[in-house]
Swiss-Prot record:
GO terms under biological process: translation
Gene that this polypeptide is encoded by: pth
Function text: The natural substrate for this enzyme may be peptidyl-tRNAs which drop off the ribosome during protein synthesis.
Subcellular location: Cytoplasm
Record family assignment: Belongs to the PTH2 family.
Taxonomic classification: Archaea, Thermoproteota, Thermoprotei, Desulfurococcales, Desulfurococcaceae
Broad class of enzyme this protein falls into: hydrolase
Pfam families: PTH2
Single GO MF annotation: peptidyl-tRNA hydrolase activity
Protein name from the UniProt record: Peptidyl-tRNA hydrolase
Recorded GO CC terms: cytosol
Source organism of this protein record: Staphylothermus marinus (strain ATCC 43588 / DSM 3639 / JCM 9404 / F1)
Reaction it catalyzes: an N-acyl-L-alpha-aminoacyl-tRNA + H2O = an N-acyl-L-amino acid + a tRNA + H(+)
Length: 121
């Protein structure tokens, strides 16, 4: 484990589409679980340290689909776990609508380089 390193997960949500509070909550949950599973598979040390230190999560406003895809690509280039969430389209949104991106868990400083300027939801 990397001592003296803080770990977190950031969920970036679309702000250019209308979602009910319940739909938004479920999309954030999908992103958090999916990104954590990616970390567990590919960055086990990061996942375990994050898990042992309280699983810090932050939800931020991300803008459009294009914006979210840009953040996801930046995270992949930094070798961070990423989950891109697309809705099934069974209730409020058309099928395959991108709703959220989960980044991390990973070192906070690496994630902040991508999401540090985004506003909290």
């Amino acid at each position: 484990m990397l001592r003296n390193t803080e770990y977190k997960q950031v969920i970036i949500v679309r702000t250019d589409i209308k979602m009910s509070k319940g739909k938004l909550a479920v999309q954030v949950a999908h992103a958090a679980v999916s990104a954590a599973f990616e970390a567990y598979k590919k960055k086990r040390e990061w996942f375990l340290e994050w898990w042992a230190t309280g699983q810090k999560k932050i939800v931020v406003k991300g803008g459009s689909e294009r914006d979210l895809l840009k953040y996801a690509e930046m995270a992949k280039k930094k070798d961070l776990p990423v989950a891109i969430i697309r809705d099934a389209g069974l209730t409020e949104l058309p099928p395959n609508t991108l709703t959220a991106v989960g980044i991390g868990p990973g070192p906070s400083r690496k994630i902040d380089e991508i999401t540090g300027d985004l506003k909290l939801l």
